[in-house]
Amino acid sequence: MASLIYRQLLTNSYSVDLHDEIEQIGSEKTQNVTINPGPFAQTRYAPVNWGHGEINDSTTLEPILDGPYQPTTFTPPNDYWILINSNTNGVVYESTNNSDFWTAVVAIEPHVNPVDRQYTIFGESKQFNVSNNTNKWKFFEMFISSSQNEFYNRRTLTSDTRLVGILKYGGRVWTFHGETPRATTDSSSTANLNNISITIHSEFYIIPRSQESKCNEYINNGLPPIQNTRNVVPLPLSSRSIQYKRAQVNEDIIVSKTSLWKEMQYYRDIIIRFKFGNSIVKVGGLGYKWSEISYKAANYQYNYLRDGEQVTAHTTCSVNGVNNFSYNGGSLPTDFGISRYEVIKENSYVYVDYWDDSKAFRNMVYVRSLAANLNSVKCTGGSYDFSIPVGAWPVMNGGAVSLHFDGVTLSTQFTDFVSLNSLRFRLSLTVDEPSFSIMRTRIVNLFGFPAANPNNGNEYYEISGRFSLISLVPTNDDYQTPIMNSVTVRQDLERQLTDLREEFNSLSQEIAMAQLIDLALLPSDMFSMFSGIKSTIDLTKSMATSVMKKFRKSKLATSISEMTNSLSDAASSASRNVSIRSNLSAISNWTNVSNDVSNVADSLNDVSTQTSTISKKLRLKEMITQTEGMSFDDISAAVLKTKIDMSTQIGKNTLPDIVTEASEKFIPKRSYRILKDDEVMEINTEGKFFAYKINTFDEVPFDVNKFAELVTDSPVISAIIDFKTLKNLNDNYGITRTEAFNLIKSNPTMLRNFINQNHPIIRNRIEQLILQCRL
């Protein structure tokens, strides 16, 4: 039958190992390499030893004590202390704005009796009577507010450090007065602060006002020792001037150049735009159940201007470390439920892979000194309506996270047409307001970012930032390093699978049921399964190998492998143990179904909780001991074959994912039954179990011990027409014992007859099974 495809995939897994071994031998084959002179001459490989290179830091540090500078005349900036180191008696500095402010400071050495001295101030000779009867120097601050007035002593600083300070700030001129080490500041007002200039006759320093405490310390206690040595030479003030140059956001610097290779350092300002992808899958049936709401990788391409240059960029957004939530509104078919919906929180990461068409990405193969910095962005979730057939719709809304830059590595993006060497920016998460909830349910006030509507109507989220890297590139700019040498951190995320899933699932409405039954009965093999894609035998063999490589890691293949190992262990123990009661006891070891059921014999509720696990194991036994009836895997494989033939997007790259996913996800709601005389025992994956008579369909008590005995030696049958459908059919139309027996055994001829008669109950049941064949 059609399910032969799954059995072939399971039994032919050995060919995959052989294929891998052949590929490995081929890759280890020796090759001749031509070596040219130069430390980087080996054209296929980068240098072995890499230094850390230049470490760039854009932080500008302003010195606390800037100087000393030579005597000069200039207009001092606001908010900076000018600290003057007087080294002789006489005029220390002169300062004026030529309107309402004239001041000069004169220095008087210790032990001076009252005396008249001549000083040249602002180009004029002035006579002041001065005296100093202390052991310290005195600095007289002479001041006038009009050119017609005479200078008078406004403040005096008595100091043993011989330091004088002046500051322009807040519309006032600030100076020190008093006696060290307890000198303090005082100020004079002026209406024209910005135009005040100063002529300094001694060495001086510049200190930012933010470091005023240090300036106060120097005035009262003196300069640091290093400033008082002869090795400190004052510089002209012009040496402090900065040649302002507009920073280049798009800069390429040659770090080194030797032979065939050169090291290029790239700086780039970037704008990252990305969006989240998601997948919402509704379970077939009455329309009240959803199977999953999950995140998917999403590509986004856009253009932006960078330093006048038009840049084309491409991003891929994916998530890691999702949290799985679920909601079950009840056990009835009309109760709303979500089997799994994904939420990202503090333990999650968002990855954004970025590429643009600049030179930095052209040869991004051998890279070092990779650094980056990005802004943060807040993502707020939108609303999603669960459109149930009857009643008020539940609505999932809200949820928010903030994304913060957490690191950068190399990666490779795969688009539909080309693979791109990229930068992967890792973003950590913090949860934010608002919380998310599902209206009309008990799910309220949960924090995180659900996958239901992550973009919230926005075309994209945007982050700006900057990165730099040093790349080893060919000296010849026309040569591009082969991408095959790139070391990537991931492979293709979903490729075209998202679009393919949507197309694949939409084809369910176009499948003719009569042809489906016929197709399910055909012994389809791998080559007939894939013939709709490629006609040549060679390509079909290659695709079959690729499918087996992927299928080998599927849940179904893993379960079969575990079962085989258990069976071997059971057979081995049977051959060694002479007290074995029967072969059935050993055979039962491979499923553990007998033990599972026996262990719960004391509690009927426990039976319900275990039947889901048991039914999955029954699928494996049915596959090994095939009956004449049709199985769920026959329908699953037939639908898969039909959709492969109808699909326009399936190719050899996506086929392995499709076949493997179909084996795991097609028809998740399955029922299996075991017959004994005129009684049927039936369990399903939802935890329901029934026991009933074939003649009347009357339910009888479910005998757990009897089921445990039967499950080891009786054939397992797929309940294509389950108990509820059978009872509905009998109650409304009436069926004979022969028809009932054939439907219970999933006889394909009987099923085809009912479908050809367009019987509504049977037809609806088959339609529901087809709708469950979703990815």
Swiss-Prot record:
Region span, Hydrophobic = 388-408
Cleavage, annotated site positions: R230, N231, R240, S241, R246, A247
Kindly provide the name given to this protein in its UniProt entry: Outer capsid protein VP4
Q: Which GO terms describe its cellular component?
A: host cell endoplasmic reticulum-Golgi intermediate compartment; host cell plasma membrane; host cell rough endoplasmic reticulum; host cytoskeleton; membrane; viral outer capsid
Q: Motif KID motif, which positions?
A: 643-645
**Region ranges (Spike head):** 65-223
State the residue spans of region: Spike foot: 509-775
Could you confirm whether the keyword Membrane appears in this record? yes
Q: Which SUPFAM superfamilies match?
A: Concanavalin A-like lectins/glucanases, VP4 membrane interaction domain
